Amino acid sequence: TFGVKLRGSYEWQTGNKLDGSNSKINSYELGLTTTLTFPRVLFPTFSKRDMNFPASTTFRLYADQMNRARFFKLLAFGGDASYEFQPTATSHHSITPFKLTFNLLQHTTHEFDSITNVNKALKKSLQNQFIPAMNYTYTYDDSPITSRRNHLWWQASVTQAGLVLDGIYALAGKKFNQEDKELLGNPFAQFIKGTAEIRYNYALGHKQYLVGRLMAGAIYSYGNARTSPYNEQFYIGGANSIRAFTIRSIGPGRYYQNSDNNKYAYIDRTGDLKFEANLEYRFPILGDLHGATFLDSGNIWLIRNDPDRPGGQLKWGSFLKDLALGTGFGLRYDLTFIVIRFDVGIGLHLPYDTGKKGYYNIPKFKDGMGYHFAIGYPF
């Protein structure tokens, strides 16, 4: 089976001015993926007897263009081969023994260059580099069991990058943490990354549901760089996260961007660790129009201390205080084949000191408002 998939997103911000100027941040992401799927396992071949459960082999080619207005464009392209197994109606295994991506930084601006000249970690994360990776993902989904009133979905994934190439270099006498290792004249990333997510859909009554979600992730880089590739790091905020706050506007940790420290003043904030919790009550309004109220919480953190981002490292004693919190309400129009969603987020707590006492520390109510138009449910 041959398939083509297009995806895109556009972000515009009416607040969060960068440096007091009147210009806004307008960013977009575009992606194209082509797939070729065979309804059996290839390489290696098994016995002629067919498996007693669905299995497939998929080859992919993909390209993703990320545009951060006023700063840079990042093109990530590559391919992979993966095996899919579904031994039961509720369990799904995905094994990707080969995935190779190349990150190409394009069209940097003078403003961006001035930032990276003094921020080497940021420059390292956005350098041209290969990401040779392998991945395993397990997914459990009991929604096919229609006799169950409530449904559970959870997924765990682990990715390792650079292990095979590092082994080859080790045979050539290179040290494990040596930083000049290359592939085709460009550095390659070395990291291990894990994510876990669980969702529970509890039916309250006629078309009324209470849906909960927990998500956690970690990435640790080593070898060629102590900073992970930019597009592999975690971020928080936006239409599918903490909806009271703009995407990539929270964290890491208690770090606060101010006029005296503008090395990260381009608003993109990323981290090595992530925790997020969401609770949403969904209910019918009229016909295909549905409503929702929600509560979102979470943050990102750094594993290693970064003097340019004080307060960004995870400290267990302040974990709860580090969690940003927002609430809000939304409308969903269900067309069966697609769901059109509009959410309004309301900020309740920021993890850094805003100068306002008490748990509700949003300086101005309007500053804690987020508006999101999206396709599909957030989780």
Label each residue range with its predicted role.
Residues 42, 87-89, 204-208, 285-287, ...:
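Short coil turns and loop connectors of transmembrane beta-barrels in diderm outer membranes
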Residues 1, 12, 92-283, 293-316:
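C-terminal outer-membrane beta-barrel translocator/porin domains of Gram-negative envelope proteins
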Residues 1-155, 243-244, 255, 339, ...:
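Gram-negative/organellar outer-membrane beta-barrel architecture
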Residues 275-283, 297, 324-335, 373-375:
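Conserved C-terminal beta-signal and adjacent last beta-strands/turns
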Residues 10-12, 18-23, 39, 307-335, ...:
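Strand-loop-strand
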Residues 78, 131, 238, 324-330:
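Glycine-centered small-residue hotspots that permit tight backbone geometry or close packing
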Residues 298, 303, 328, 332, ...:
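Flexible, small/polar- and glycine-enriched "cap/hinge" segments at structural transition points
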Residues 290:
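Conserved catalytic motifs of the protein kinase core domain
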